[in-house]
Each structure stands twice: as structure tokens, then as C-alpha cells.
Swiss-Prot record:
Substrate binds at residue 252. It is an enzyme of class 1 (oxidoreductase). It catalyses: (2R)-2,3-dihydroxy-3-methylbutanoate + NADP(+) = (2S)-2-acetolactate + NADPH + H(+); (2R,3R)-2,3-dihydroxy-3-methylpentanoate + NADP(+) = (S)-2-ethyl-2-hydroxy-3-oxobutanoate + NADPH + H(+). This is Ketol-acid reductoisomerase (NADP(+)). Pathway: Amino-acid biosynthesis; L-isoleucine biosynthesis; L-isoleucine from 2-oxobutanoate: step 2/4; Amino-acid biosynthesis; L-valine biosynthesis; L-valine from pyruvate: step 2/4. Mg(2+) 1 binds at residues 191, 195. InterPro entries: 6-PGluconate_DH-like_C_sf, KARI, KARI_C, KARI_N, KARI_prok, NAD(P)-bd_dom_sf. Its EC number is 1.1.1.86. HAMAP family: IlvC (MF_00435).
């Protein structure tokens, strides 16, 4: 059975004795920085000139430096920019400021796993990945709880990288819930697979096909939306609370029987074979290569696919129906129906 690491197993003073630069102040960046500071760690924020996040970081009491200056100042550099921007950020601002004894921290292993970033000799490279979005990481920390983390070490030049990684994980509150040891390869490949095959790609396509099937059969779009998208949250919440078993325990006998007899007709064995092909593309680096090449070219495929998704009729139906939901409160910085960030 996997060993779980908790607060009692890690020495917080290790990260408290280091100067930490958090590069990026988005979802994960703000949570890591605030939690570390509340844990007694000296933190500065690294942001490019003109960054829209600068005002927020300064309002929350942080010193903001350029990524280059922050990296030169720090002992521990935490790179929390989007995957596609990390390579350029590292080359332009971080690499030349890395000296023996410093540590690079990532929350996702993409750029290390696929070779887009290579640290110089003498630098530790670690992964501390909370299994939740940044606002949840921060909220749980403030409540005296934590979000579970997975932790890995790619390069242990100092011989003490694991100890510092666990200390960092404790500093952001992750070991209150528990930490699991992994590798950069395992974290990256399973994370991408989960996103593509199940959580994002698989679920989005399943919902769209369900909506289209009901619409093509003559049912009202509003009813179709409720049945294949709106109620999905109710089912996922049950699965989150107690697994598939609790979800099946909570629904009617009719729904449970339909689950058993019709689920395999929709998600048939060939779907599993397709999943294996998706995983193979991830493992071989084919997906990463396709993504980065598209991003380097200005993201034409990415933007075309995003636009196509936004134009699906389920989106216009949803925008109208969500106006009826008194309990629905959108994020302040989100425009309903838009994927663009």
C-alpha cells in the first residue's frame, strides 16, 4: 500500500530557511505564495513587466520583481506559469540565475518529462502538485485543512531534495491532508491522460454526443441540457464523495439497472482501446510535440478547436438556462460561454 506522508513527517524549518520566488501569480501561484508566507516563508513574486497580475500581488502585500531578478534573489524558484510559456520563461529569465544548491519547483511535470527544460548540474528539481485548483488550496489552508499533494524528485543534486520537497509541501498545507510519493513521469503522463480521456476530453465529448442525440430525436434543447449536462454535477459529486459505489447506492433502481446494461453499450471495449492509443501518444511525446508546435506557431489549431466548441448549440442553450438558476454565481472574471482566458 502507498505510504502517506503527513505534517509530522516533514520539517517546516527547511523551507522557512530558504528564500522562495514564485514565478507566476495565477490560480496555483497565488495559493502557493500566500500559504508559504503564512507558514513563515520569505516569498517574492516574479512577473513580467506589464503583467495584469502585478497589482493583485502587490495589493496582497508581496514584493514583485521581474522573473530574472526574482530568480537571482531566490534559493528556491517555483515555476507556475502555463506549460507552453515555461520553456521561454526559463530560457530568458531563470536558467542563467541557477547556481549550485538552488532548487527548481514545479506543480506539473510537463516541461521536465518531455525535455523542454533541463536544469544545470548542481540544481535540485522537484515536483509538488496539489490535487486541486489554486482557490481550493488557499481556502482549505485558511480553514486549517489542506489539499492532498503528490511529490516527486527528478534531480537530487544536494542529496536533500526529498526533505526540502516535503517541507515545501507542508508549507502550502498539503501534508495536512497527506502527500504521496510519485515521479515526474508518472505525474505527467497520468495527469494528461486523465484530462484527455476522462475529465475534460472524454466528458465533454460524451455530453455533446448525448445532447446531439436527444436534439436529433426531436426533444427540446432545454430538456436535453438538463438531462445530459446540468445533472452531471449531482452524479459526479456522489462519485467524489464515495466512489462509483455511492453513486449507484444513491440513485433509483431504474437508473442503477440502466447504468449496468447501457453503460457498456455506450462506452464499449473499443473505447478502452482508443484510450490506450491516447496514452501511447502521451507516453511517446507525440501529444506534447503537437501542442508545443501549435503554440509556437500562434496556436491556430488550438484556437480553431476552441471556437468550434464555443459554437456548439449546447453552449447557447446553457447560457439561457443558467439565467434561471438563482444559486448560480459565476466567477467575477469569467464571461459566460467563453473559453478564452
Amino acid at each position: 500500500m502507498t505510504d502517506i506522508v503527513y505534517d509530522k513527517d516533514a520539517d517546516l524549518s527547511l523551507i522557512q530557511g530558504r528564500k522562495v520566488a514564485v514565478i507566476g501569480y495565477g490560480s496555483q501561484g497565488h495559493a502557493h505564495a500566500l500559504n508559504l508566507r503564512d507558514s513563515g516563508v520569505e516569498v517574492v513574486i516574479g512577473l513580467k513587466e506589464g503583467s495584469t497580475s502585478r497589482a493583485k500581488a502587490e495589493e496582497q502585500g508581496f514584493t514583485v520583481k521581474t522573473p530574472s531578478d526574482a530568480s537571482a534573489w531566490a534559493d528556491v524558484i517555483v515555476i507556475l506559469a502555463p506549460d507552453q510559456h515555461q520553456r521561454g520563461l526559463y530560457a530568458d529569465s531563470v536558467r542563467d540565475n541557477l547556481t549550485e544548491g538552488k532548487t527548481l519547483v514545479f506543480a506539473h511535470g510537463f516541461n521536465i518529462r518531455f525535455g523542454y527544460i533541463e536544469a544545470p548540474e548542481g540544481v535540485d528539481v522537484v515536483l509538488v502538485a496539489p490535487k486541486g485548483p489554486g482557490h481550493t488550496v488557499r481556502r482549505e489552508f485558511e480553514a486549517g485543512r489542506g489539499v492532498p499533494v503528490i511529490v516527486a524528485v527528478e534531480v537530487d543534486a544536494s542529496g536533500k531534495a526529498w526533505d526540502l520537497a516535503w517541507s515545501y509541501a507542508k508549507g502550502i498545507g498539503g501534508l495536512r491532508a497527506g502527500g504521496i510519493r510519485t515521479t515526474f513521469t508518472e505525474e505527467t503522463e497520468t495527469d494528461l491522460f486523465g484530462e484527455q480521456a476522462v475529465l475534460c476530453g472524454g466528458t465533454s465529448q460524451l455530453v455533446q454526443y448525448g445532447f446531439e442525440t436527444l436534439m436529433e430525436a426531436g426533444y427540446q434543447p432545454q430538456i436535453a441540457y438538463f438531462e445530459v449536462l446540468h445533472e452531471l454535477k449531482l452524479i459526479v459529486d456522489l462519485m467524489w464523495e464515495g466512489g462509483i459505489a455511492k453513486q449507484r447506492w444513491s440513485i433509483s433502481d431504474t437508473a442503477e439497472y440502466g447504468d449496468y446494461v447501457s453503460g457498456p453499450r455506450v462506452i464499449s471495449p473499443d473505447v478502452k482501446e482508443n484510450m490506450k492509443a491516447v496514452l501511447a501518444d502521451i507516453q511517446s511525446g507525440a501529444f506534447a510535440d503537437r501542442f508545443i508546435k501549435d503554440q509556437d506557431a500562434g496556436a491556430p489549431e488550438f484556437l480553431e478547436l476552441r471556437k468550434k466548441g464555443e459554437e456548439h448549440p449546447i453552449e447557447s442553450t446553457g447560457r439561457e438556462l443558467r439565467k434561471l438558476f438563482a444559486w448560480n454565481k459565476a466567477d467575477d472574471d469569467y464571461t459566460d460561454g467563453s473559453v478564452a482566458r
